[in-house]
């Protein structure tokens, strides 16, 4: 590689060059679906240093299409850093000069952790559609085992956005003694009927692709690209607000004249197709199906006759709940539903709705007020954990 094409110097507020690690587990993991994973791998990255008392660990939980690479660069050839680099690094909201940050790829994922693309030891072939259904609870149990492996008894904070926020909530309920603070961003305590409907449309787009082969597409040396492309296009529409789409694309055409056909004419069409095409070759379709079903299934209040306040009763840590004004996928009203339940249950909670034009995807971006509030809360976490001079 010509040195002129390499990044000359990594940003000063970057965690720098990072490398994934793999933890292998031979202790069987019983799953909510009734099946058991006899063994499995979890791929993860860490940023910062674990202190002597092991009290500065922070866990990052990823969203639907996320993975372990949340910050930094794998090489100087990388065009982009990890997916949450805007918030993880020296001096950033999740300050790696203070905190030891862990980010992993969940079970069922397609970025190294055991999932549909991995080999099923019982058959010698890829798991494919035989990989068991996962739930948010299953992920949290596996994450707790990773914490055990790393010698971390209690996290200073567990943090996540979107589906990651649901995992944070589940952590506070399943392992209240192991989480000192919870940060739930752009999330919901359960999906609405509309959100389940969006997920079902995406799944049907994938499953109806002739190249899907009932999930065994790898054995046919193909990919259900068309279906996954459509699923991602639908998803992107829900991740952006109407205002964001309007300001970014409006009704702009790719050329000066209408072509009176079905080829791409509007810039927004071009954008959606590009996003879909890119995703269709970089993400696994079976993983997408699993992740959306885990979203659908999450509903901690269901076991309490729909009483969310009763469901959150086991939680014992302070919460920061963040929503965004134009997020219509998980709107502020759903965050307030969680906040109201926490208040009724007598739990300490701080809530803010950030005025942002960027819709659901705002949780990924460096919004000024969002960063300030996030950093302030994490500063309090550091203070309460005695990490100010770490």
UniProtKB/Swiss-Prot annotation:
It comes from the Bacteria. The record marks 329 as: Important for acyl-CoA specificity. GO terms for molecular function: homoserine O-acetyltransferase activity; homoserine O-succinyltransferase activity. Its EC number is 2.3.1.46. Residues 56-365 form the AB hydrolase-1 domain. Keywords: Acyltransferase, Amino-acid biosynthesis, Cytoplasm, Methionine biosynthesis, Transferase. It catalyses: L-homoserine + succinyl-CoA = O-succinyl-L-homoserine + CoA. It holds the Pfam family Abhydrolase_1. Substrate binds at residues 232, 361. Pathway: Amino-acid biosynthesis; L-methionine biosynthesis via de novo pathway; O-succinyl-L-homoserine from L-homoserine: step 1/1. The active site is at residues 162, 327, 360. Coiled coil: none annotated. HAMAP family: MetX_acyltransf (MF_00296). This is Homoserine O-succinyltransferase. It comes from Litchfieldella anticariensis (strain DSM 16096 / CECT 5854 / CIP 108499 / LMG 22089 / FP35) (Halomonas anticariensis).
């Amino acid at each position: 590689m010509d040195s002129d094409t390499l990044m000359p110097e990594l940003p000063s507020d970057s965690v720098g060059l990072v490398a994934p690690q793999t933890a292998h587990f031979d202790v069987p993991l019983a799953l909510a679906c009734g099946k058991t994973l006899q063994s499995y791998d979890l791929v993860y990255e860490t940023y910062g240093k674990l202190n002597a008392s092991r009290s500065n660990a922070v866990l990052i939980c990823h969203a639907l299409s996320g993975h372990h690479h949340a910050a930094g660069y794998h090489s100087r050839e990388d065009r982009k850093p990890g997916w949450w680099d805007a918030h993880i690094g020296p001096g950033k909201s999740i300050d790696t000069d203070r905190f030891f940050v862990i980010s992993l790829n969940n079970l069922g994922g397609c970025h190294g952790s055991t999932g549909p693309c991995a080999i099923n030891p019982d058959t010698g072939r890829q798991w494919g559609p035989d990989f068991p259904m996962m739930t948010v609870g299953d992920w949290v149990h596996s994450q707790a085992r990773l914490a055990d492996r790393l010698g971390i008894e209690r996290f200073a904070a567990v943090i996540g956005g979107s589906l990651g926020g649901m995992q944070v909530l589940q952590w506070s309920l399943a392992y209240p003694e192991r989480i000192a603070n919870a940060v739930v961003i752009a999330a919901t305590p359960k999906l609405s009927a509309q959100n389940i409907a969006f997920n079902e449309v995406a799944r049907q787009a994938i499953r109806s692709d002739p190249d899907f082969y009932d999930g065994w597409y790898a054995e046919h040396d193909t990919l259900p690209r068309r279906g996954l492309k459509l699923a991602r296009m639908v998803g992107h529409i829900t991740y952006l607000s109407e205002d964001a789409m309007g300001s970014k694309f409006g009704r702009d055409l790719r050329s000066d004249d209408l072509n009176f056909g079905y080829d791409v004419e509007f810039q927004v069409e071009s954008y959606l197709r590009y996003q879909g095409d890119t995703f269709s070759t970089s993400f696994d379709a079976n993983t997408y199906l699993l992740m959306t079903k885990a979203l659908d299934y999450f509903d901690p209040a269901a076991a309490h006759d729909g009483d969310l306040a009763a469901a959150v009763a086991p939680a014992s840590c302070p919460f920061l709940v963040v929503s965004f004004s134009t997020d219509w996928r998980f709107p502020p009203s759903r965050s307030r539903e969680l906040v109201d339940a926490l208040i009724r249950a007598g739990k300490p909670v701080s809530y803010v709705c950030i005025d942002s034009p960027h819709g659901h995807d705002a949780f990924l971006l460096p919004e000024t007020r969002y960063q300030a509030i996030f950093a302030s809360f994490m500063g309090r976490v550091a203070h309460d954990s005695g990490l100010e001079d770490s």
